C-alpha cells in the first residue's frame, strides 16, 4: 500500500491530530543495514522525520529500545542472570538515546535525555514535573533506561511515560511493516492489515504489537496506539496531518 502525499505542513499544533505524543522505536531501527550498533545516516534520517513533526509544534516524547546493542532476554536465554541482563539492556537504551540526541541537536532541535537510572554526567534523572516543563518549552524528551527496573520492556516504559506525560497517543515506528497485520506479512502474501483494532483483539489474537503488560496499561488508560512504518519518508508527519497508512489500536 502507498501513502498519499502530505499536505502543507501545519504551522501550529492546533492543526494536527495530536498535540503531545510518545514515539517508540526499536533499537534495531537505528542499525540501518548493519548487523549491530548505530548507523549514523539512519539515525540522522529518523531525526529528520522527528524534526518535521517538531516543526509542526507537536510536543514529542521518545523511547528507544536497545536491541541493536544488547537485549536482556537474549542474554538471559544464554545463561546470564535475567536481572543483570536487563540492566545491561537498559544501559544500551541510554547509548541509543545519546546518539539520537546528538542527531536531533545537530538539526537544531533542543533535546533532553532523561534516564530512569541516575547517571548525572550524561543524562537528567527522571522527575515528572521537570520533564513536563521541558515539553512545554518544546524540547524533545528522550526517556532512557526503561522503567529503571528489570523484567519490564521498553514498550512498557514507553506506555508508562506516555501516561505520566499526558501524551495523547503512542506512535510506534516499525521497520518493513506499515501497521498491524493478521499474520506476518514478510511470510504470508495474503496477510491483511487492520485499519483499526481493539486492544482486547490484539491480546486475544496474540498479535505481535507490544508485550501484554504494555497493551494492558495502554488499554486501561484509554491511550491509543498508532503503528506505522518508519521507512516511509514523511510518514510520521503525514499521520499527524491526517494522512498515510497505519493501524490504530484503541478501545
Curated annotation (Swiss-Prot):
Q: Does the keyword Disulfide bond apply?
A: no
Q: Please list the GO biological process terms of this entry.
A: 'de novo' CTP biosynthetic process; UDP biosynthetic process
Q: Where does ATP bind?
A: 24-27, 67, 71, 175, 181, 184
Swiss-Prot/TrEMBL catalytic activity:
UMP + ATP = UDP + ADP
The entry's UMP-binding residues are 66, 86, 147-154
Q: Identify the main location.
A: cytoplasm
Q: Where in the cell is it found?
A: Cytoplasm
Please give the activity regulation comment for this entry: Allosterically activated by GTP. Inhibited by UTP.
Protein name (Swiss-Prot/TrEMBL): Uridylate kinase
The species this protein belongs to is Ruegeria pomeroyi (strain ATCC 700808 / DSM 15171 / DSS-3)
Question: What is the primary gene name for this protein?
Answer: pyrH
Amino acid at each position: 500500500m502507498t501513502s498519499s502525499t502530505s499536505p502543507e505542513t501545519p504551522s501550529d499544533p492546533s492543526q494536527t491530530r495530536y498535540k503531545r505524543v510518545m514515539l517508540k522505536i526499536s533499537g534495531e531501527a537505528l542499525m540501518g543495514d548493519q548487523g549491530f550498533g548505530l548507523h549514523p545516516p539512519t539515525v540522522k534520517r529518523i531525526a529528520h522525520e522527528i524534526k518535521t513533526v517538531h516543526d509542526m509544534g507537536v510536543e514529542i516524547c521518545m523511547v528507544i529500545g536497545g536491541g541493536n546493542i544488547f537485549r536482556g532476554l537474549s542474554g538471559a536465554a544464554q545463561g546470564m542472570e535475567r536481572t543483570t541482563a536487563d540492566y545491561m539492556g537498559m544501559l544500551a537504551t541510554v547509548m541509543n538515546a545519546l546518539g539520537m540526541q546528538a542527531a536531533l541537536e545537530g538539526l537544531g532541535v533542543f533535546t533532553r535525555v532523561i534516564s530512569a537510572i541516575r547517571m548525572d554526567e550524561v543524562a537528567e534523572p527522571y522527575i515528572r514535573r521537570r520533564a513536563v516543563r521541558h515539553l512545554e518549552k518544546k524540547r524533545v524528551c528522550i526517556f532512557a533506561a526503561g522503567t529503571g527496573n528489570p523484567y519490564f520492556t521498553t514498550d512498557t516504559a514507553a506506555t508508562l511515560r506516555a501516561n505520566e506525560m499526558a501524551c495523547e497517543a503512542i506512535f510506534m515506528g516499525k521497520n518493513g511493516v506499515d501497521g498491524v497485520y493478521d499474520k506476518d506479512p514478510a511470510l504470508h502474501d495474503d496477510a491483511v492489515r487492520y485499519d483499526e483494532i481493539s486492544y482486547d483483539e490484539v491480546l486475544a489474537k496474540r498479535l505481535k504489537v507490544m508485550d501484554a503488560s504494555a497493551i494492558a496499561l495502554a488499554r486501561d488508560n484509554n491511550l491509543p496506539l498508532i503503528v506505522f512504518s518508519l521507512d516511509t519518508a514523511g510518514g510520521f508527519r503525514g499521520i499527524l496531518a491526517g494522512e498515510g497508512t497505519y493501524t490504530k489500536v484503541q478501545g
